[in-house]
A protein has these predicted regions:
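Secreted, disulfide-rich extracellular signaling modules
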Residues: 2-6, 12, 18-438
């Protein structure tokens, strides 16, 4: 059963009168006046919600690494990948010699943590092929069994800003076995089903003392295994055979332990949302771990006390990230989305711009010098007009999250501050007109 968790932490909006000269409208028997009024601190009730899982199968970016944060807790990102078979027809006039077997990794530019520290990754073999029934999928919470011992481990230093390619030489014994089987025309290369039975796939597992999570591209060449070999006849010719990730059976798995943080008691499900007033006046949003937000305006109808008739002229929502919670080790998302829901949290639509067509994305403003005036803003004029004067089942709410792509492929994050004792808190600026009969 759903619980109504409306918080009464806000005070009535403070009205700063910016009145026009009284205007007489005709020579009616009833005198009337219009006023322009500006309200600058309409309260915002922002809550944090946790998704129970996020589908990460088939993503074009994977995440690898481990990071411990005082705000978020301990997070590990593991990548599971099935590889596709590759075509090879040996020439009986040639002999073949191995050069190397290389894993090619290309950073996506995303990171979370200290990029100056080294990361150590162990590569395990999946115990069995990934098989999905019609109603199954692969999620950030999915855990698949691996062999007990790693095939190989390697260390690298993240360079997300430069997107410097990471090339990892895999064991020659593995490369030689692949080459021997290819030359012998072993039939497990004939189809993908045969190939995955012989070689179920790899799991990239970070060590638990790492202090950075790095994003890597996944495509025909990135996260690929490349067999470098020589064709030998009268001369030697270098060749490369590539085994790329079969993205239909590959995903990023996340392990998150929020012990010791404001998130520790949060349970998954929108019915378990927690208001910022119960989380240290903070609200959390992050990709891949599944945190997003709900926004309500519990005192919106208090505007009615300003006059007999209230006409909303404009409404702008301002959301402030917690100072010093970003940039050094984490990345603010450039785009965030607002979704309109009904009382039962059924999605109805996006929040659009003034043209009624363009989806708003938060209009991020960054204070490069001091960081105090960094904020997201949304034009909520139409939404506030539609909801002013409503209550109960007629009152709409807003859900806020990263874009679908960032939610499933990055750890981009925002911690919003909503402390009523601070100047920069979540707020709704409303300009409106009032009409009073005299």
């Amino acid at each position: 059963m759903k619980k109504s968790l409306y918080s009464l932490f806000a005070v009535l909006a403070i009205f700063c009168a910016c009145q026009d000269e009284n205007s007489q409208l005709g020579k009616s028997l009833v005198e009337s006046s219009f006023y322009n009024v500006y309200a600058d601190t309409c309260s915002v009730d922002i809550s944090t919600i946790l998704l129970d899982s996020i589908e990460t199968r088939g993503d074009s970016i994977c995440q690898l690494g481990h990071y411990r944060s005082s705000a978020w807790g301990e997070v590990s990102a593991t990548y599971y990948a099935e590889y596709s078979t590759s075509d090879f027809t040996p020439n009986t006039d040639y002999t073949y010699t191995l050069d190397s077997l290389v894993l090619r990794m290309i950073p996506s530019g995303h990171f979370w943590g200290d990029t100056l520290t080294q990361q150590r990754i162990s590569i395990y073999r999946l115990k069995k092929p990934i098989v999905l029934d019609n109603d199954e999928d692969l999620y950030n919470s999915t855990v698949l069994p691996t062999e007990d011992a790693p095939l190989f481990s390697f260390t690298f230093t993240p360079c997300p800003g430069r997107k410097k390619e990471v090339s990892v030489r895999l064991p020659d014994s593995w490369g030689q076995q692949l080459l021997n089987d290819l030359v012998a025309q072993d039939d497990y290369f004939d189809t993908q089903d045969k190939f995955k039975k012989k070689f179920p796939g790899l799991v990239f597992v970070p060590e638990n003392d790492g202090q950075c999570i790095t994003g890597f591209m996944v495509n025909d060449s990135a996260m690929s295994i490349n067999l470098h070999y020589q064709e030998v006849s009268n001369q030697r010719t270098g060749q490369v055979l590539t085994f790329n990730v079969n993205t239909d059976y590959a995903y990023t798995g996340i392990r998150h332990d929020p012990t010791g943080t404001h998130l520790a008691s949060l349970k998954s499900g929108i019915e378990n949302l927690v208001h910022s007033s119960d989380m240290g006046c903070l609200a959390y949003m992050q990709g891949l771990t599944g945190y997003y937000n709900q926004l309500e305006f519990p005192y919106l109808n208090s505007l009615g006390s300003a006059g007999q008739i209230v006409s909303i002229e404009s409404a702008t929502l301002y959301l402030y990230p917690l100072a010093r919670s970003y940039n050094e080790v984490s990345q603010l998302p450039n785009d965030i989305r607002l979704y309109i829901t009904d009382e039962n949290n059924v999605l109805e639509d996006y929040v659009y711009g003034s043209d009624g067509v363009t989806v708003q994305t938060g209009d991020l403003t960054i204070d490069e010098m001091y960081g105090k005036e960094t904020y997201y803003s949304f034009d909520l004029t139409e939404f506030i007009r539609n909801n002013y004067g409503t209550s109960g089942i007629k009152r709409q709410k807003l859900l806020m999250s990263l874009t679908d792509e960032e939610s499933t492929t990055t750890f981009n994050q925002v911690i919003f501050t909503n402390d009523p004792e601070q100047e920069n808190q979540c707020k709704l600026d409303i300009r409106f007109k009032i009409y009073n009969e005299q």
